[in-house]
């Protein structure tokens, strides 16, 4: 996006303003005679799916990492570790099929929805995809906590769970942050799985239970059909730049929160 100037050509066109692009509520690039290039529905969908995915994945990932590092015996840990690492290598389209067959019908029944494809379905699928990364990195960070620190805490009368909460987790916060950032990176940039389960409706969602569309899904679905050099093509390149800055913003936010906890 930096090497190619396509991402900025759209804004140089006098017929399309910065406000129309970033505050526009309609994405209809093939409309005639006036195509609509509003990014707001796509930005909103990306943020909703990504943030809900992390809210789902983080507590589960941290709980499993704590269990593997501090509670599980050697045999169980050796059984769980390769299984979790194997999950991280499964193609995203397989997760998408799983979401389409299992999660989408389940949400449709539980919430009595007209269609099960929704932002929540995408968030759950992305959370499942991010879990192996979060668990693996967090568990490795916790196991690096010095044994002497654990023994000193227990010698002072702290229980095992107090030691985990007051000693192990604070010591491992940098590793936990790395796992979360890597998980967020996969969630924000994921394409195929989200494309299959979110409904792909380019409208601003009023609920996480409504269909929506994310930026990566839009780029993947439309780039092949957009005429090279046209306004639609340039808008998709600009969407890629926006996605890059959204990823940076979320990562900086996570890093700032974890830095505050370290202090």
Segments from the language model and where they lie:
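Residue-level signal for discrete positions within transmembrane alpha-helices
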Residues: 42, 46, 82-85, 89, ...
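Periplasmic/extracellular loop-to-transmembrane helix junction in inner-membrane transport proteins
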Residues: 2-53, 73-74, 221-233
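Generic hydrophobic transmembrane alpha-helix motif, especially the helices
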Residues: 85-123, 127
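Cytoplasmic-entry segments and transmembrane alpha-helices of multi-pass inner-membrane transporters
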Residues: 60-99, 137
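C-terminal transmembrane helix and the adjacent membrane-cytosol boundary/short C-terminal tail
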Residues: 139, 143, 147, 154, ...
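Transmembrane alpha-helices
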Residues: 137-138, 154, 160-198
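Hydrophobic positions within alpha-helical transmembrane segments of bacterial inner-membrane proteins
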Residues: 46, 50, 54-62, 66, ...
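Interhelical loop and adjacent transmembrane-helix boundary motif
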Residues: 109, 194-244
């Amino acid at each position: 996006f930096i090497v190619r100037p396509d991402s900025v050509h759209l804004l140089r066109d006098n017929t399309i303003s910065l406000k129309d692009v970033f505050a526009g509520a309609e994405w209809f690039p093939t409309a005639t005679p006036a195509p609509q290039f509003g990014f707001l529905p796509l930005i909103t969908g990306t943020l909703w799916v990504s943030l809900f995915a992390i809210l789902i994945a983080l507590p589960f990932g941290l709980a499993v990492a704590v269990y593997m590092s501090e509670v599980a015996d050697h045999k169980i840990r050796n059984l769980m570790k390769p299984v979790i690492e194997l999950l991280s290598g499964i193609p995203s389209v397989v997760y998408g099929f799983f979401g389409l067959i299992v999660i989408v019908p389940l949400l449709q029944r539980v919430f009595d929805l007209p269609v099960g494809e929704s932002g929540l379905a995408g968030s759950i699928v992305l959370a499942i995809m991010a879990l192996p990364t979060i668990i693996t990195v967090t568990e490795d960070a916790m196991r690096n906590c010095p044994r002497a620190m654990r023994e000193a805490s227990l010698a002072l009368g702290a229980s095992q769970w107090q030691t985990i909460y007051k000693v192990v987790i604070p010591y491992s916060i940098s590793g936990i942050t790395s796992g979360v950032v890597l998980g967020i990176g996969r969630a924000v940039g994921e394409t195929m799985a989200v494309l299959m389960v979110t409904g792909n409706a380019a409208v601003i969602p009023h609920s996480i239970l409504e269909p929506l569309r994310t930026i990566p899904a839009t780029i993947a679905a439309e780039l092949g059909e957009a005429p090279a050099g046209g306004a639609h093509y340039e808008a998709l390149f600009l969407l890629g730049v926006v996605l890059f800055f959204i990823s940076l913003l979320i990562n900086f936010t996570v890093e700032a929160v974890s830095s505050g906890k370290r202090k």
